[in-house]
């Protein structure tokens, strides 16, 4: 079981940011979380869809990242950028993440969904 808390905001600069708080039944190490993010491959990556980012989740080690202005176009705007992973006093961990509103969240997300449905045979 995983417990997740989330505080999100949409920025006037075309991006969504979230502060994520997460707890697990068995707390992983920080290194295990970073490894899971680095190795994550969803259906879009497994099927090598045209609009899919090669690396869906990007973790930034810098303490001031992710930043919408600097990171919104990671993987042509189709990645989720993560940073500031640290232990929390109430939850196991907290971290920040952001994505491009239009490219990942709306238009690009819709195109990627259509590619996935086509690859899975829903239009046959």
Language-model regions, residue ranges each:
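Short amphipathic alpha-helices in soluble, non-transmembrane regions
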Residues: 30-41
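Acidic Ser/Thr/Pro-rich low-complexity disordered segments
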Residues: 49-50
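Metallocofactor- and cofactor-centric catalytic cores in central/energy metabolism, strongly enriched
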Residues: 3, 33, 68
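Conserved glycine-rich beta-strand-loop-beta hairpin in the small C-terminal domain of fold type I
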Residues: 14-19
């Amino acid at each position: 079981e995983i417990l997740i808390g989330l505080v999100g905001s949409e920025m006037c600069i075309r991006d969504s940011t979230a502060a994520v708080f997460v707890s697990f039944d068995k707390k992983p190490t920080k290194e295990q979380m970073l490894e899971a993010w680095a190795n994550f491959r969803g259906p879009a990556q497994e099927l090598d869809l045209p609009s899919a980012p090669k690396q869906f989740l990007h973790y930034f080690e810098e303490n001031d990242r992710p930043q919408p202005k600097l990171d919104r176009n990671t993987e042509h705007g189709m990645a989720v950028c993560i940073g500031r992973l640290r232990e929390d006093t109430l939850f196991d961990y907290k971290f920040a993440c952001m994505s491009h509103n239009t490219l990942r969240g709306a238009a690009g997300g819709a195109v990627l969904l259509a590619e996935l449905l086509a690859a899975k045979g829903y239009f046959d």
